[in-house]
Amino acid sequence: MLLTKREKHLLAAFQNYGKLSLKQMIDLLKVSQRTVYRTISDLTDSLNTINISIIKENQNYFLVGELANLASIISLDTYEQYERLNLITYKLLMSFSSITNEQLQEEFNVSNVTIIQDIAEIEKRLADFDLRLDRKKGYRLVGNKNTLRRLLAILLTNNLSISDFGAGAYGHFEVLDKAKLELAKQIFQSSQEDLPDLDAKMSEFFIILLALSGWRDNEAVGHSISKAALDFSQKVYTEFSQKTNQFYSIQEILYYASILDELVIKRQETPLFHEKFDSAFFYNISNLIDKVSLYTKINFAKDKTLFHFLFNHIRLNLAVPQIFEDKSNNTIAHEVVQGNEYLHRVVSLLVQDIFPKYLQKEPEYELITLHFASSLRRSPDIYPIKILLLTDERPLARELLITRIKTIAPFVDKVVVKELAQYETKDKDYYNCVLATKPLVDKAVKMVSTYPDAKEMLQLQDYLQNVQAHQKIIIRDEQTNKQGYNLQNYFLATQQLLQEFSYQEIDNPADFETSVPKIMETIAAVSDKTYLSSKLLKCFAVSPLAIPETHLALLHTQSSKVITSCFKIYDLKRPVTALSMNYEKETVTRILVMLTRLDETKEMRDLMTAISQSIIENHLYTEIYKTGNKDIIYQLLNQIFTEKIKKLET
C-alpha cells in the first residue's frame, strides 16, 4: 500500500497519540479543515484494504482493527506543490540543457497535467525577475546570467533554514559543491565584522552567492561601486581564491561587490554619514508610510519605530524575496489581516504601486500590513484612546490595574481615575470608554475586576482593541507638554546648531550645479569652498536628494573642510532643476544644507542625524521645511532636538 506524505504523517500521529481531535489534526498538518477531512477519507480507504478503520467517538478520531498490519505500509515520496515548484526551478537553474516533461513526471511521481500547471506557474513567477522559459525540446531558463546566478542564491536561501544551513544539512540541494559552500561560510563569517549588521538570512544569501562564484560566466557590471563594497569583495575573494586554488576574474569580484553595494552598503538606516546611499529606497519607505496615513486617515508617521521596522523588513525581502511559499500555512500575519481588511487593501495597492514586481506576493502584503497593524496596537501616539476608571480601591490596587491595562493595550494614552460616586453620565463624552471595578446601572460602563485573571485580561484586551478600532468622537481636554532634559553634552550641541542655523534668500545662477558654489560662498564655517562644492555635487550625482513633489533639495556631507557643523536653508531667487530621490527631475526652489565636521562629537552627529531623518522620513516635517519661515523652522529644530533628548533620557 502506498501513502502520501500527509497521510503518513497523520497515521504516525495516530500511532503516537492514539486519539486525535479535528483541531489537533489541523494544527499537525497545517492545512484547512476541508483538507483534513479529505486526508482522513483517503487514509481510511487505504487502511480498509488491510482491515483497519478510522472511527470517530466524542469528537476524537482513532484507529481500530488489525493494527499489526500497519507494518506492510510503504510511504510514497511525494511533494507539496510549493516544494515541487522550488525543486523544478532549482533543476532548471542548474541544468545547461533542456529538461523534458517526461523527466519531471518520473522524478516527482505526478501526471503530465500537473507538470504543465507547475511549469505555467514557474514561468509566470520568473517573469517578475525578467527571465523566460524556452520550450524547445523541453524546458530551459533563458535570461541575464547575473540574474540567473542571483536567483539561484535567492532560491537556495528560501529553501535552506538558518539552522539547516548552519549544520550543513542541504536536503534536496546536495548537488551543490558542499566543500566550497563550507569554505565560503568560514571566509564570509570571519570577515563579516567589516560590514554593517546583517540579518542571518542576508548573511546566508551572500555566503551562497560567494560559493556560486564561477557558476555560469557572469556579465559586466555597469554602475559605480562604493569603496566599502569593493574592499570587502577583494578581501574575501583573495582568501577564497587561495583556499579553493582557483582564479576568479575581476568581473566576479565586481559582480559580488555590486550586489553587496545594492543590498547592504547603500541601504543603511542612517544615511547621513554615508557618501553613497539608495535615496530611492529611503523615499519609497517614507512614501509608503505617508500614503497609508493619507488613505486611512491615521498618522502612522507619529510612530517613531515604524520606519525602522519597515526599512529592515523590506530591505531583507527585496534582497531575498520569497519565490514560492507554502500557501497552506496560516500565519499570524494572515490572521491579523482578517481584522484589518481596509488597511490590508490600502497597503496591497500601495506596495504594488511603489515596489518592484518580484515583491508582489500576498504573504508580503500581509506582513507589511502586520507592521502597520502592530503600530496601531503598539503606540499611544498613533490611534490613542482615553479611559475613565471608576473605582474605590486603594491607590496601590488601582495603579496595579492601570499598569496591567497599559501592558495589554499600549495604545491607551491616558487612564483617569474617579471614585464610583463621582461618576456622571456626561463623563462618557470625554472618554473612549468607561471601566468600573463594581457593577453599575449604566450598561455602557464595562465591569472589570480589581485583580483580573488571565482569561479576563484577554477579554479586556479584545474589548479595548475593539474600542480603538471603532473610536467615537470625544471632547478632549487641552494637554500641556512638559519638556525637560539634563544631558549637558546634547544641550551644548543643541545650542550650537540653533546658533549656527540661518535662513536666507540667495540670488543664484540659473542651474543647480552653479548654484551650489554660490551657496558655499556664503558659509563662513567652510575653509575650502571650491573643494566642498565639488564634493557636494559629486555626492548628489551618486545619491540625489531632491525630495519628490516638494521643490526641496538636501545637500549634506561630512568633511575636514567644515570648521563648524551647521544646518542652513536657502530660498532660491531662480528655480533650478535637480535629480530627485526617485531619479526624476524636480524643480527646486529651496535648498537645505547640512555640513558636519569630520571629527565631530557623537552628540552633534546624533542631532544632525535627527535633522536628516526628519527631512527624509517625516512628511509632516518635510512640509514645514518646504513652506516654513525662519522662526517656524527654528521652532521645529528645537522640537526635534527636545524629542531626541527626551527619548535618550527615557
From Swiss-Prot:
Signal peptide: none annotated. Residues 490-640 form the PTS EIIA type-2 domain. Its EC number is 2.7.1.-. SUPFAM superfamilies: Phoshotransferase/anion transport protein (SSF55804). Residues 276-382 form the PRD domain. One of its GO terms (biological process) is regulation of DNA-templated transcription. The modification Phosphohistidine is found at H556. It is an enzyme of class 2 (transferase). Keywords: Kinase, Phosphoprotein, Transcription, Transcription regulation, Transferase. One of its GO terms (molecular function) is kinase activity. Gene3D superfamilies: Mannitol-specific EII, Chain A, Winged helix-like DNA-binding domain superfamily/Winged helix DNA-binding domain. It comes from the Bacteria. PANTHER family: CRYPTIC BETA-GLUCOSIDE BGL OPERON ANTITERMINATOR (PTHR30185), TRANSCRIPTIONAL REGULATOR MTLR (PTHR30185:SF18). The PTS EIIA type-2 domain may serve a regulatory function, through its phosphorylation activity. Not necessary for mannitol utilization. May be involved in regulation of the mannitol phosphoenolpyruvate-dependent sugar phosphotransferase system (PTS). This is Putative transcriptional regulator MtlR. It comes from Streptococcus mutans serotype c (strain ATCC 700610 / UA159).
